[in-house]
């Protein structure tokens, strides 16, 4: 699984593509750009992944977006809960993660 981490100021964004869910290894890329939109676009183009969707939050939250067809699962985690997220990720099915914070949009 490829996990793209974009970080600047107090904004943390996690973006995950559905075609990579079968992999269990995590590779992180950290970016601290002066202008988030420009650098995010550049990073995704460099990775040849223009199909990623990026969600932003100005608070200290981590946002994970999993796209599957027309459905989107959005997981919201506080920074203090990220350790439990990774623990659950490696021990649980992808569909059972963060069910208290999951929102389905079809």
UniProtKB/Swiss-Prot annotation:
<feature type="transmembrane region" description="Helical">
    <location>
        <begin position="39"/>
        <end position="56"/>
    </location>
</feature>
<feature type="transmembrane region" description="Helical">
    <location>
        <begin position="74"/>
        <end position="90"/>
    </location>
</feature>
<dbReference type="GO" id="GO:0016020">
    <property type="term" value="C:membrane"/>
</dbReference>
<keyword id="KW-0812">Transmembrane</keyword>
<keyword id="KW-1133">Transmembrane helix</keyword>
<keyword id="KW-0472">Membrane</keyword>
<protein>
    <recommendedName>
        <fullName>Putative uncharacterized protein YOR282W</fullName>
    </recommendedName>
</protein>
